[in-house]
Design a protein with these regions (language model features):
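Cytosolic-facing loops and C-terminal tails of multi-pass membrane proteins
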Residues: 2, 79-111, 255-369
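Short helix/loop segments within enzyme catalytic domains
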Residues: 124-125, 211-272
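Short pre-active-site segment immediately N-terminal to the catalytic Zn-binding motif
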Residues: 162-177
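Juxtamembrane/interface helices at transmembrane-helix boundaries
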Residues: 28-35, 83-166, 307-312
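Hydrophobic transmembrane alpha-helical segments in integral membrane proteins
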Residues: 1-18
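Alpha-helical transmembrane signal-anchor/signal-peptide segments
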Residues: 63-69, 116-128, 215-218, 309-327
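Hydrophobic alpha-helical membrane-insertion segments
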Residues: 42-60
Length: 369
């Protein structure tokens, strides 16, 4: 396992491309059925794990690039001298700068979470529930009403809470909201949301990193909608959608980045949720094929690294390629071989290396003056 400038460049390029592919995939099919949601969530988790492992392994396949890339790596590999610090490559200085910003972002997220949880502890508990999560463990969930909240949300990895806004809900709407948030808690969505937000905060410098959080949120909300509405009749589904619309009209930014809210997304996401609840459309087979290809690309990206390929001019003058015109071998009487390039004698070989076995071989008598 090695870490170098090449692994960093590979990491940035591949993760950026994969993020674009995943974003385009979910944009083309915003209303996902259960298999589609599984593909998207699997892709998001794999992509997040890929971001955490910017290394080169023993089984890594090297892909050499000879244009532009050598100049880029040469620029970032140049040694610079900062005051009071030892000389080091430019990319190491930039990495330290990026790490410092990532640390500040993580600290900011943690502080926001701590302050909001402390505020919630000051609110009276209106209801309490006991649920069984996906791991078969019993969890106690308490519910509070926040007069300043504009969105219903679930928060807390080990001590989950449901926060309700101080809006005028009917008893049926209140039950539906609670079922939605309890579905998030029982499915482990808070843990997945926490993981994705931490990765996004650390790798803020990866192009299109915001797509990772948006795709995860969309898939989690559709899954919760499915768990809540799959056993409801049409009138109850309409009541559920009316509840979503009521919250969406006054919804603002979620007070904690680690919370899973009833409303997370823009107008397009809300339309997709309405369509899913009312129609339960099926994702096209083409979506599954493309999603599978994206997953395979993510898995293969763990074992690929881009390396610059550059031969200095002074070295190039003393080397040749088997594809060069005028290169050939001459079979000697003693069984050896003479190597010629453009009629210039290069040296004698006792055997033919694999790299030049494609060169034409002439008889010694043909070349003898």
């Amino acid at each position: 396992m090695t870490f170098s400038l090449s692994t960093i460049c590979t990491h940035v390029v591949l993760c950026g491309v994969l993020l674009v592919l995943m974003s385009a995939l979910t944009h083309a099919a915003p209303c996902l059925d259960k298999p589609g949601r599984i593909w998207v969530m699997t892709g998001c988790v794999l992509l997040a794990v890929r971001m955490l492992l910017p290394f080169e392994w023993k089984v890594t396949k090297t892909i050499y690039i000879s244009r532009i890339y050598p100049e880029v790596t040469c620029f970032f590999n140049q040694t610079i001298q900062l005051p009071y610090l030892p000389a080091c490559p430019l990319y190491m200085v930039l990495l330290c700068f990026v790490a410092a910003i990532s640390t500040v972002r993580l600290a900011g997220l943690a502080l926001t979470q701590y302050r909001y949880r402390r505020y919630l502890r000051s609110l009276p508990v209106t209801e309490a529930f006991t649920i069984v999560n996906r791991l078969g463990r019993t969890q106690k969930v308490r519910c509070v009403t926040d007069p300043h909240a504009s969105n219903a949300l679930a928060i807390g990895l080990f001590k989950p809470q449901i926060v309700l806004p101080a809006l005028s809900f009917t008893e049926q709407e209140r039950r539906l909201i609670l079922r939605h948030e309890l579905a998030h808690i029982a499915s482990g969505d808070i843990a997945l949301k926490l993981f994705v937000e931490i990765v996004s905060a650390v790798y803020w410098w990866i192009p299109f990193i915001g797509a990772l959080s948006r795709q995860t949120n969309a898939a989690l909300e559709l899954r919760a909608d499915d768990l809540v509405t799959k056993e409801l009749d049409e009138s109850q589904r309409l009541a559920y959608l009316s509840c979503l619309l009521k919250v969406a009209k006054c919804s603002r930014r979620t007070p904690s980045p680690f919370a899973v809210g009833l409303m997370t997304g823009k107008e397009g996401s809300l339309k997709a949720r309405f369509r899913y609840v009312l129609e339960h459309p099926r994702t096209s087979p083409l979506f599954h094929v493309v999603a599978l290809l994206c997953i395979v690309m993510m898995a293969l990206s763990f074992f690929v690294v881009f390396e610059p390929y550059h031969i200095p001019d002074d070295v190039r003058a003393e080397t040749f390629s088997p594809r060069d015109e005028g290169a050939y071998l001459v079979l000697r009487e003693d069984g050896g071989y003479d190597l010629y390039v453009k009629e210039a004698y290069m040296g004698m070989l006792t055997s033919i290396p694999e790299e030049i076995q494609s060169l034409p071989i002439k008889n010694y008598k043909e070349e003898k003056p």
